[in-house]
Amino acid sequence: MLILSTSAFATTDTSKPNILSIWGDDIGPFNISAYNRGIMGYRTPNIDRIANGGILFTDSYGDQSCTAGRAGFITGQHPIRTGLTKVGLPGAKEGISKKDPTIAELLKPHGYMTGQFGKNHLGDQDEHLPSNHGFDEFFGNLYHLNAEDEPEHPDYPKDPEFKKRFGPRGVINSFADGKVEDTGALTKKRMETIDEEVLAKTLKFIDKAHAAKKPFFVWFNTTRMHIWTRLKPESQGVTGQGIYADGMVEHDGHVGQLLDKLDALKIADNTIVMYTTDNGAELLAWPDGGYTPFRGEKNSNWEGGYRVPMMVSWPGKIKPNQVSNEIISLQDWMPTILAAVGDTNIKADLKKGKTVAGTKYKVHLDGFNFLPHFLDTSKEGPRKEFIYSSDTGEVVAIRDGDYKMVFRAQACHGLETWICPWKVLRAPKMYNLRMDPYERMDHEASNYGQWYMEHMFLMAPSMYKVAKFKQTFKDFPQRQKPGSFVP
């Protein structure tokens, strides 16, 4: 969830909005009652408050997995460009580069206090810690949740050198002054309440910034609802619909505490709130996993792997109770946030080369400024296309307006989605995501073949646009080769 606030109560300079970005993990749109209207048997009233107070997006895109979605948000670049398409593992060398500016680094010259709390997943080494990328403070874990409890498995090697080389680090508390503290392992027991630890740190940081009359950028990342879900006794059985539903209710309560903090500080009326997550639902662990009506799941080329919840409110600026069908991506938030603080030229400036706090950056932002659409939804959104990538860094599909072309398909399901090779197609699969948003008609409709052949004129333009995207890598080459699970 993202919050931008122009409160005179929170900051002496009302042109500098506060920014609070709150994320769930592996939560698909249909797991939130603002989207599902209660059909899943539970409600998320606090998250729904954000949707009801502003804009709910129906065509919002994360990425195919955790690292890619988070990298796209914080850098404003396509994950292929940063080389951060593969899920980061303990001990991996890949991570966010100092050559790629973050939202936090770009906000520091505007006087912001910056804090990141909760899951990071943008690199294992100290050089990758958020406190080395523009954040004043970081407190959280570095990987996907199920990597954290591996040392407790009875088959885990007892050799301390193995754990040192390949094991997960603990929950890290680090600061921009170079201090790094390992607060201990994220054990199965600690997982029950780690989001409460993260929430407490976040609330304290907001209080600190408010007392200092400084604008803040806070990125809050929960472990809910990544597998494996471990709930404290008080959160178990509250819905009667299983562990995922119970976890969602707990997660919604944490969102409520953040919104209540804004009320307590009297800044809610001047705050933009955006809620989202990194990727689509992960079905393989159901019922300890998300659910989606879209085809596929996390780490596939299908909509179910990419569609994420996204909603934004800003009382007095954004009208309440709106629904937008514009295509929007996590990559769009960097230029949008910078526009909200008054910098509408950040994309062009970074492309030419821009010095920020003594460091020169020259990067190609793939995101677009959505602020004009937020303020007046009668204006079309600036994004007309979306490039889908595999975790190995290949273009697998493109959405161009209503139409999607799939060039590489993942035919496997469940865990096999992570193991099976991609099938390179001789001609793209084609879908109209308005007529067929769930990508079913190629195997359900008897007339799909005729419809496909009648729309083959769309193939060449889609290939041209992918080629145009790839051409930008000539001047802005891939930062690093993505990681791999095979040698």
Predicted regions and their residues:
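Formylglycine-dependent sulfatase
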Residues: 3-428, 437-487
